[in-house]
C-alpha cells in the first residue's frame, strides 16, 4: 500500500511531523490531538529535506506518500552526488556511474534507513571528501586574499558548505570539520608551516557560518523559556504513536 509508510521507528517519523504540522492540515489519525503541535523554535539543521518535504507537501498531504517518497529519493540522491564528485575529480563516466551507484546502495545507507533516515541521506559526504582533496591539492583554493572570489572553486565551496551544513542534522558537518582538521594537520606537517592549513580553516569557517543561522530558532526558544523540539523532544514519542496509528486506522 503506497499510503502506508515503508519503515517505522527512528528519526524518520520526524518527517511525518513536518508534513502533518508545518506543511498541511493535521491528519485525523489516532495521535491527534493528543500530541503537542510544533512551535516556532525548531532548529533548521536539516534544511535539505525540510525543503524536499515542503515541496512534496505542496502536491499531497498524505503522510504515507510523502514518507515513502522520502525513503525512495535517498539512495538516488546519494548516488547522484557520488557520480558528480567522481566526475569532478576526473574519472570516466562509466567509472563514476559505477562508483556512484555503489555509494548510493552501500549497506550503511540501507541499515540507517529504518533507524535514522536523516543519516542515510548522506549525499553531501562525497563533497566533504572533495573539499579535503581541494585543500590538499590546490594551493589557490580558499586562500585568503584579493583574488579569493575570482576562483570558481571558492564559490563552489561556499555552495557545498551550505549543503553540508544543512544535511545530516549536524552530524555530517561535524564530521566534515574533523576531516578538514586532519587534512590541515597533514598539510602543516608536510610543508612544516602553519599557513599550509589556511584553506582548511577557511572551509571550516564557511561550514560553521552556514550552521549558525540554523540554530537561531532553538536559541530564541530557549531564551523565551519555551525550548524547542531539540530540547524538549516533542516529536519523538507523540509522532511515533501517530505514525504507528496509520497501520491501525
Role assignments for model-derived ranges:
Residues 1, 198-206:
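Start-transfer (signal-anchor) and selected internal transmembrane alpha helices
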Residues 33-34, 58-59, 143-149, 194:
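Short, aromatic- and cysteine-enriched interfacial helices/patches
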Residues 70-89, 93-188, 207, 213:
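Membrane-embedded helix bundles of polyisoprenyl
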Residues 118-119, 143-144, 196-199, 223:
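A cytosolic-side transmembrane-helix exit/cap motif
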Amino acid at each position: 500500500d503506497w499510503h502506508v509508510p515503508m519503515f517505522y521507528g527512528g528519526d524518520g517519523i520526524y518527517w511525518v511531523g513536518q508534513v502533518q504540522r508545518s506543511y498541511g492540515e493535521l491528519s485525523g489519525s489516532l495521535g491527534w490531538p493528543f500530541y503537542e503541535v510544533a512551535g516556532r523554535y525548531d532548529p533548521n539543521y536539516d534544511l535539505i529535506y525540510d525543503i524536499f518535504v515542503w515541496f512534496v507537501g505542496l502536491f499531497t498531504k498524505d503522510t504515507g506518500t510523502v514518507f515513502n517518497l522520502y525513503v525512495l529519493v535517498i539512495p538516488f540522491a546519494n548516488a547522484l552526488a557520488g557520480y558528480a564528485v567522481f566526475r569532478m575529480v576526473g574519472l570516466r563516466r562509466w567509472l563514476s556511474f559505477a562508483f556512484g551507484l555503489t555509494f548510493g546502495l552501500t549497506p550503511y545507507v540501507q541499515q540507517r534507513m529504518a533507524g535514522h533516515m536523516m543519516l542515510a541521506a548522506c549525499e553531501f559526504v562525497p563533497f566533504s571528501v572533495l573539499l579535503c582533496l581541494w585543500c590538499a591539492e590546490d594551493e589557490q583554493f580558499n586562500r585568503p586574499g584579493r583574488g579569493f572570489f575570482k576562483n570558481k572553486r571558492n564559490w563552489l565551496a561556499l555552495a557545498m558548505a551550505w549543503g553540508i551544513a544543512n544535511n545530516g542534522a549536524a552530524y555530517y558537518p561535524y564530521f566534515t570539520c574533523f576531516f578538514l582538521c586532519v587534512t590541515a594537520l597533514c598539510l602543516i606537517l608536510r610543508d612544516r608551516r602553519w599557513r599550509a592549513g589556511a584553506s582548511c580553516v577557511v572551509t571550516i569557517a564557511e561550514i560553521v557560518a552556514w550552521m549558525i543561522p540554523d540554530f537561531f530558532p532553538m536559541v530564541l526558544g530557549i531564551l523565551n523559556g519555551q525550548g524547542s523540539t531539540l530540547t524538549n523532544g516533542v516529536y519523538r514519542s507523540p509522532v511515533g504513536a501517530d505514525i504507528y496509528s496509520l497501520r491501525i486506522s
